[in-house]
């Protein structure tokens, strides 16, 4: 089979310049449907079009999860960008900031329906090829429905596309109850799994990467069931007055604990399938170093490679419809020396202290729980020493907060005087302790370039910059793009730990097993050992509630800056308590260390109950009065 990847790229470019109204009764491709299924070549292009309908994970203005929880922010000059406006709580039903209801996803679902109806008649495809493509498109259809459900709550499942001659009244659909929506999505995925049509292992990776595998189907099912079991969708009495036209609750009002058991079984099955397919956690041995590195630098680079090392063994499915290219990376990158060209590293994206402080100490427990960590003085100054030379420049001052942190802190974040190995023609020294680092105090080479090109908090999301992106010289950069990692194994392992913990009366070895796999890869000891030896709450891992907090924090750390926290904080219903806060950083306008390392407000974040779901655009309700608006909008 020809490579579908190139067709995906072309389709992605096309979808960016087109739109489609969900209520249009004429399918997008009705005029060319006969041609679309003429032969193998046109069908492969159509399949790529279906894949291109996925939400653009790497687009900060169309992915609500990048800035939606403000785990990352833009500087104030770009605070009016749609993504930031969404995160700051300025969405509205009359002018929806990120609108998936009117276009895009429903259009993609219609494309999927058309594809499944038409591909069966293509003569130069064998039956295996047809069934595989149908399974792929059915999984795409399930994914798009799930995304809509996660974002809007009750949706209008598009089981079949309406005929072209359907009346206006006939296409005016109703929102269905949440449980019915979830049930339909699970049924779609089960049909895919039961068909056994998706490959366990790609036989020709160069032409198949980016397509769905059996592992992806099982992980998606596990994720859907995990969400269905979570507080937002399971017995959510906050929506007791949100009723459909028949006076029935859109959200079930009685908590069902057995859903966690079902989710746990699905997660374990997904883990088993992934293991049989060779999916595993990315390790230090997977990172190819050109020079001998210290264990510290090697681990940091490997943890960066988890995200940006293309098609690495941890990736279950990467979104080739949304590539992390120079557009996003340049906003996360910085300068390592004086440059005469200030258009390479735009450095608009920053990580606030609320995210920075989540990462564990080097003992693998929260810094506010570590009995040995100088938490009270974390904003004070400390000078880099030989012990920390692979993380912080020796002899330079930075905050206590940046010392004695776990390896994921240093792989995820760049900071003033913090080592940043690689990514430059002169940044792979024989002794990696001599690698370059940002200098970000006012007037230094990493501080503001052109107007608006500065880091607002003093922390860069280094994680999102490819390990193979590099300065060719002081003034030019070669960017290496990579597909956004929408499904990866570490996420699945933590999902498994969460579902198991919630399904049991108290955590046990099975719960610890899955979270400890992720921690071990990050260079940390197991949960029980770490809390027993260093935490001022040594018994926390022994209770269901304690492990819930630990697992949630582990997800916030392991998946930081990947847009996962936005969805997690919604399904856990923790956003209301966590996201009414000051967004803070360092005083980036100061030139001395004493003045720079002063906690400084950047934004005020607000969140209310209505923000758990986005509003249906008012224009859609005008067109279809049968749609009921989400509460609060």
Where are these regions (language model features)?
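Bacterial Sec-dependent N-terminal signal peptides
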Residues: 1-28
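Long, intrinsically disordered, low-complexity segments
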Residues: 20, 105, 184-186, 208, ...
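Membrane-proximal, proline-rich intrinsically disordered regions
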Residues: 20-66, 243, 401-403, 617-633
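Conserved, well-structured interaction surfaces
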Residues: 39-58, 79-152, 168-209, 214, ...
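Short coil/turn linking the two alpha-helices of tandem helical-hairpin repeats
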Residues: 149-150, 156, 227-236, 502-505
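Short coil/linker segments at helix-helix boundaries
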Residues: 154-175, 232-262
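Flexible, polar/acidic helix-loop-strand segments at domain edges
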Residues: 327, 333, 353-354, 358-369, ...
């Amino acid at each position: 089979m020809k490579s579908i990847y190139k067709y995906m790229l072309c389709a992605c470019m096309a979808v960016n310049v087109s739109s489609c109204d969900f209520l249009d009764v004429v399918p997008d491709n009705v005029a060319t449907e006969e041609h679309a299924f003429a032969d193998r070549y046109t069908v492969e292009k159509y399949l790529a079009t279906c894949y291109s309908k996925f939400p653009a994970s790497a687009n900060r203005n169309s992915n609500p999860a990048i800035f939606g929880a403000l785990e990352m922010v833009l500087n104030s000059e770009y605070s009016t960008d749609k993504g930031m406006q969404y995160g700051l709580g300025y969405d509205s039903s009359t002018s929806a900031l990120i609108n998936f209801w009117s276009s895009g996803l429903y259009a993609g679902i219609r494309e999927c329906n058309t594809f499944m109806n038409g591909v069966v008649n293509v003569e130069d495809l064998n039956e295996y090829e047809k069934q595989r493509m149908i399974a792929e498109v059915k999984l795409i259809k399930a994914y798009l429905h799930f995304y809509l459900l996660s974002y809007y709550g009750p949706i209008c499942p598009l089981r079949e596309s309406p005929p072209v001659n359907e009346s206006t009244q006939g296409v005016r659909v109703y929102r269905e109850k949440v449980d019915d929506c979830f049930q339909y999505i699970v049924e779609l995925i089960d049909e895919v799994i039961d068909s056994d049509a998706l490959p366990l292992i790609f036989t020709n990776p160069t032409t198949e990467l980016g397509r769905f595998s059996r592992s992806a189907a099982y992980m998606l099912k596990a994720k859907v069931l995990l969400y269905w079991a979570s507080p937002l969708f399971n017995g959510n009495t906050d929506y007791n007055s949100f009723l459909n036209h028949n006076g029935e609750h859109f959200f079930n009002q009685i908590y069902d604990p057995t859903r966690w058991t079902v989710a746990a079984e699905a997660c374990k099955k997904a883990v088993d399938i992934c293991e049989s397919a060779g999916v595993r956690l990315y390790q230090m041995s997977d990172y190819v170093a050109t020079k001998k590195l210290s264990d510290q630098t090697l681990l940091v680079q490997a943890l960066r490679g988890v995200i940006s090392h293309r098609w690495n063994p941890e990736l279950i499915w990467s979104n080739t419809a949304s590539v992390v290219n120079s557009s996003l990376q340049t906003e996360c990158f910085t300068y390592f020396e004086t440059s005469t060209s200030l258009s390479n590293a735009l450095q608009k994206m920053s990580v606030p202290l609320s995210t920075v402080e989540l990462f564990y100490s080097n003992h693998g427990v929260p810094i506010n729980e570590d009995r040995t960590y100088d938490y009270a003085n974390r904003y004070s100054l400390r000078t880099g020493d030989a012990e920390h030379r692979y993380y912080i420049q020796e002899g330079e001052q930075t905050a206590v907060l940046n010392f004695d942190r776990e390896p994921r802190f240093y792989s995820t974040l760049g900071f003033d005087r913090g080592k940043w190995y690689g990514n430059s023609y002169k940044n792979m020294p024989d002794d990696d302790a001599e690698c370059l680092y940002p200098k970000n105090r006012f007037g230094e080479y990493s501080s503001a370039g052109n107007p608006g090109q500065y880091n607002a908090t003093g922390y860069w999301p280094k994680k999102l910059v490819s390990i193979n992106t590099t300065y060719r010289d002081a003034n030019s950069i070669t960017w290496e793009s990579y597909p956004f990692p929408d499904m990866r194994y570490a996420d699945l392992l933590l999902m498994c730990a969460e579902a198991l913990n919630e399904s049991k009366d108290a955590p046990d070895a099975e719960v610890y097993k899955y979270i400890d796999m992720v921690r071990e890869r990050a260079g940390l000891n197991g949960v029980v050992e770490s809390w027993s030896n260093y935490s001022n709450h040594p018994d926390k891992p022994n209770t269901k509630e304690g492990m819930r907090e630990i697992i949630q924090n582990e997800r916030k750390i392991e998946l930081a800056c990947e847009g996962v926290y936005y969805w997690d904080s919604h399904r856990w219903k923790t956003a209301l308590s966590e996201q009414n806060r000051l967004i803070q950083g360092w005083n980036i306008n100061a030139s001395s260390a004493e003045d720079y390392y002063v906690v400084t407000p950047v934004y005020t974040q607000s969140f209310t109950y209505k923000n758990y779901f986005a509003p249906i655009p008012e224009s859609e309700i005008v067109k279809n009065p049968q749609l009921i608006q989400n509460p609060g909008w």
